[in-house]
């Protein structure tokens, strides 16, 4: 799960901005937190980005999605995915620095996230699509210090957690070393990290193309849950199906014992938005739990 994401010098953001899921030590709503033991910080299950129109909310999501896409796209292109499905691909915004003084202002991003009993820190700095710095550290939860997995500074790469002997360090300056390791080697700690990045879902509904993507499953439990959520929100569908012959997605309603079908694209905009958003929200809540 994501603990913290920070970045600066990206599009409309010049100064460091932190999207933090670490909970403040307040008694209120403590039962709603993702509780850690005595050696771990409590985490918020949900974070909210709010502000005026044009205030940069979408740019924060793009900053997050761009780094994830930078890491996972090469892995996808070379068919080296650890998972069977990649949610976050080809984020449209480029990793573009804020054009105040582009020669001196590289784009910087940093992630803290947990996988199992470990917390990872991944950091990357980019200028003109070239990676200047990249590092990955791992800390076992409860430990006071983190161990270096690898660190890349320009063309120099050092290792810590595993022996780098036999690993090629001649990496294209436009490719992340994390991606390079996944594509060319089988290293358990790297596999664990890339699995987390592959599972990330960044949905920015300011992008109209996002409204055309449906996340569905053939699992009966998923279908039943999705229909129940739609019903709870006042949308009286009884089912859905895909017509493979006409390549059409249909929502079903039952009226007076008879079932009727309506093409998804003929539904109201609100129904379409909910049907696209709810599966992603449900998956996020399940994973976060």
Name each model feature, range by range.
Residues 2-69:
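Pre-Walker A-like glycine/lysine-rich segment at the N-terminus of P-loop NTPase domains
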Residues 5, 109-111, 131-139, 247-255:
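Short polybasic amphipathic segments
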Residues 12-14, 115-119, 256-257:
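Glycine-centered tight beta-turn/hairpin loop motif at sheet-sheet or coil-to-beta transitions
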Residues 46-50, 246-289:
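Conserved ABC ATPase signature
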Residues 79-109:
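Extended, loop-rich substrate-binding clefts of extracytoplasmic carbohydrate-active enzymes
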Residues 102-119, 124:
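Conserved amphipathic alpha-helical "coupling/scaffold" segments
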């Amino acid at each position: 799960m994501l603990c913290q994401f920070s970045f600066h010098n990206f599009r409309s953001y010049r100064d460091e901005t932190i999207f933090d899921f670490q909970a403040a030590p307040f008694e209120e709503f403590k039962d709603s937190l993702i509780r850690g033991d005595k050696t771990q910080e409590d985490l918020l299950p949900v974070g909210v980005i709010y502000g005026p129109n044009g205030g940069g909310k979408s740019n924060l999501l793009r900053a997050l999605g761009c780094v994830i896409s930078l890491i996972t796209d090469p892995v996808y292109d070379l068919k080296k995915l650890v998972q069977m499905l990649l949610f976050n691909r080809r984020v449209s915004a480029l990793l573009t620095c804020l054009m105040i003084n582009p020669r001196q202002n590289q784009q910087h991003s940093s992630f803290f996230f947990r996988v199992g009993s470990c917390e990872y820190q991944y950091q990357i700095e980019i200028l003109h699509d070239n990676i200047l710095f990249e590092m990955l550290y791992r800390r076992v939860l409860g430990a006071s210090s983190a161990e270096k997995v690898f660190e890349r500074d320009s063309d120099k790469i050092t290792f810590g957690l595993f022996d780098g002997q036999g690993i090629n360090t001649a990496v294209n300056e436009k490719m992340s070393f994390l991606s390079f390791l996944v594509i060319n080697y089988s290293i358990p700690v790297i596999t664990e990290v890339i699995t987390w990045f592959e599972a990330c879902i960044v949905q920015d509904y300011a992008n109209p193309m996002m409204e055309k993507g449906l996340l569905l499953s053939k699992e009966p439990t998923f279908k039943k849950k999705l229909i129940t959520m739609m019903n709870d929100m006042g949308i009286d569908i009884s089912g859905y199906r895909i017509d493979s012959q006409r390549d059409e997605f249909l929502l079903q309603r039952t009226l007076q014992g008879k079932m009727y079908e309506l093409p998804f694209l003929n539904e109201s905009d609100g129904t379409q938005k909910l049907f696209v958003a709810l599966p992603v929200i449900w998956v996020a809540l399940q994973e976060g739990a």
